[in-house]
């Protein structure tokens, strides 16, 4: 049993070594000419290093999208709506050199141009004060100094208090309720 387990371990190790070996680098190793950063594409050609901080990765992503080794549905990304009609069109079939630096083929968009019409109404509100408070679960949310205009509220910000909840009808929280509901019975005083 030990001999079969050892043979299996040796076979798995040999398989891993064979699968991870790169035949191009074994033949090209010659003293000082070998560079650990050199890479080869699917056709066996050396790829140039575009820059030292990942330029090679950009090239590899470009080659993966247009290589014949990747199936069409994997290299093709999501469709986008055409600006010329309601029909959804696939990605443009222009060569990678003509479709932008990253080869996306997508029209570049600014964050402000994103269509937010399908989002909730809460997202469209820019300020918390614009939210409609009429549907709040408690009916006692009131503002003090509601007779002041919004200009006065901004001008006298220190005099304008935060929103408050009216708790005067509860036994705790107002002077009026302390007279009505004392904590100690009157006959003990």
UniProtKB/Swiss-Prot annotation:
Give expression by tissue.
Answer: Orcokinin-like peptide: Expressed in corpora cardiaca (CC), corpora allata (CA), antennal lobe (AL) and gnathal ganglion (GNG) (at protein level). Expression in CC, CA and GNG detected in some animals, in AL in few animals (at protein level). Orcokinin-like peptide precursor-related peptide: Expressed in corpora cardiaca (CC), corpora allata (CA), antennal lobe (AL) and gnathal ganglion (GNG) (at protein level). Expression in GNG detected in most animals, expression in CC, CA and AL detected in some animals (at protein level).
Per the similarity annotation, which family is this?
A: Belongs to the orcokinin family.
Function of the protein: Myotropic peptides.
Q: Name one GO cellular component term.
A: extracellular region
Which source organism?
A: Agrotis ipsilon
UniProt superkingdom: Eukaryota
Which compartments does it reside in?
A: Secreted
What keywords tag this UniProt record?
Answer: Cleavage on pair of basic residues, Neuropeptide, Secreted, Signal
What are the coiled-coil residue ranges? none
Propeptide at 22-124, 145-174
Q: What is this protein called?
A: Orcokinin peptides
A GO BP term here is: neuropeptide signaling pathway
Query: Where does the signal peptide begin and end?
Result: 1-21
